[in-house]
A protein has these predicted regions:
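PLP-dependent amino-acid enzyme catalytic core
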Residues: 1-349
Length: 349
């Protein structure tokens, strides 16, 4: 499904907003330099002609989340040099990123993760020295539990998506795409809580309002598309059962809603099926030789399904591959099915 705003974005109303937040994203680039990797932008004609990918699985914790985590933690220390620790909620990737930032900056760290979270990601958070709180935690109550712990411990909250410091850090990806691709025509980002999409939209639209920004989410977690259709901040009734565990937020954040829906800085939101996500993962693994997780593959899934409109002639489509922390059991299942299909004369994705 493809969803567009009711009316074309009026960027004239957004000039001050864009200038303020684009400046903060530029500051974040300088702040996090030396703490995160400046990932390359790679041609991906093996996926489709005129496509490039941003492989954020090459970051130290395997996802883009280190950008927002380090920007938030460093900004915290700039404001409160005596801060002793941080707390966050996460399904995995953000938790790893905050744990790494906390360890490297000498801060205590607690990560509230729902029961049943990806065991690879839970183990990785613990390996980085963070305390994991999961007992009785669900996707629906995790933020409430984190706020309770924050009040008891005095730790500073680093929100995974609904905080400007986090959004500004994620927006550094947009600046890098602009630097790398003079012929950039379209940016495609996953959307869960909306931090990555919002940050990239601000960075791109502030410099190049002609570049289209498209968000992609699973059909089973299509709250952002519902919000764009209705103009209201829609929320899912229960945690979605999508394979894309990093995109299981019940809703986009308040700040994401402002950027994506109210200010119309995102041109389209599209959705993809679970099978399309799996086929996209296999395509990235086998064609680009990059390990991408389900959440990171949704942009390629939309592209392969024909839901991303062609860019204007001569311009590129840049797809953000947001992470590569895959559950080994899922990898084994997909690769076994792929091998069986090839063995019986089936085609590769």
């Amino acid at each position: 499904m493809v969803t567009e705003p009711d009316a074309a974005a009026d960027l004239g109303d957004n000039d001050g907003f864009l200038a303020e937040h684009a400046a903060a994203i530029h500051s974040a680039t300088s702040r996090i330099a030396g703490h995160v990797r400046r990932t390359p932008t790679l041609p991906a004609d093996e996926i489709a002609t005129g496509v490039a990918v941003k492989p954020e699985m090459l970051q130290p914790t395997g996802s883009f989340k280190v950008r927002g985590a380090f920007n938030a933690a460093l900004s915290l220390l700039g404001r409160s040099p005596d801060a002793r620790g941080v707390i966050t909620v996460s399904s995995g990737n953000h938790g790893q990123a905050v744990a790494l930032a906390a360890r490297n900056l000498g801060l205590d760290c607690t990560v509230v993760m729902p029961e049943g979270s990806n065991p690879v990601k839970v183990a990785a958070v613990r390996a980085l020295g963070a305390r994991v709180v999961s007992e009785g935690v669900t996707g629906a109550n995790r933020e409430e539990r984190a706020r309770e712990l924050q009040e008891r411990t005095g730790l500073a909250m680093i929100h995974p998506f609904d905080a400007w410091d986090t959004i500004h850090g994620q927006g550094t990806i947009g600046l890098e795409l602009l630097d790398d691709l003079a012929d950039l025509g379209t940016v495609v980002c996953p959307v869960g809580g909306g931090g990555l999409l919002s940050g990239c939209a601000i960075a791109v639209k502030a410099a190049r309002p002609d570049v289209r920004v498209i968000g992609v989410e699973p059909e089973l977690a299509a709250d952002a598309a519902a919000s764009m259709r209705s103009g209201r901040h829609e929320r899912l009734a229960a945690p979605p059962a999508t394979i894309a565990d990093g995109l299981r937020s019940l809703s986009i954040g308040d700040r994401g809603f402002e950027v994506i829906v109210r200010r119309r800085l995102v041109d389209q939101l599209v959705t993809v099926t679970e099978d399309e996500i799996e086929q996209a993962m296999l395509a990235v693994w086998t064609r680009l030789h990059l390990v991408v997780e389900p959440s990171g593959a949704v942009g390629v899934a939309a592209l392969m399904a024909g839901r991303i409109p062609p860019s204007p002639a001569g311009s590129r489509i840049a797809v953000v591959l947001s992470g590569g922390n895959v559950d080994p059991a899922l990898s084994a299942r997909l690769l076994a099915a792929h091998a069986a299909r090839l063995a019986t004369g089936g085609s590769a994705p």
